[in-house]
């Protein structure tokens, strides 16, 4: 099963999206957006940029855990990964976003 995007609304009324792999695990989390339309634009940006390796910023957090950001052509962060146990697992996470980020399935959980 291929991945999908989930749009949800936070308690403060803002929106976010999460890209989930086919097994349901979250692999990319967005920032908060003021409108659902803006969150959907973020999804479109993932769909457009996720296949390009140059769009991934590979980082290490202060706790020494590897993670990554997916960036748009204008260098704005589109989404951030979870923390990984190793660089190899982070790189597998990037491959998963590359494979699932083109998904056109959007599950709207915002009510």
At which residue positions do the language-model features occur?
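Short arginine-rich
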Residues: 47-55, 98-107
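Short proline/glycine- and acidic-rich turn/helix-capping motifs at secondary-structure junctions
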Residues: 65, 110-111
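Glycine/alanine-rich phosphate-binding loops at beta-alpha junctions
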Residues: 37
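Charged, low-complexity amphipathic helices and coil/IDR segments
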Residues: 1-2, 103
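A structural feature that tracks compact, well-ordered secondary-structure segments
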Residues: 4-8, 14-22, 27-33, 42-46, ...
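A cross-family "folded-core" feature that marks the main globular domain of proteins
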Residues: 13, 107-109
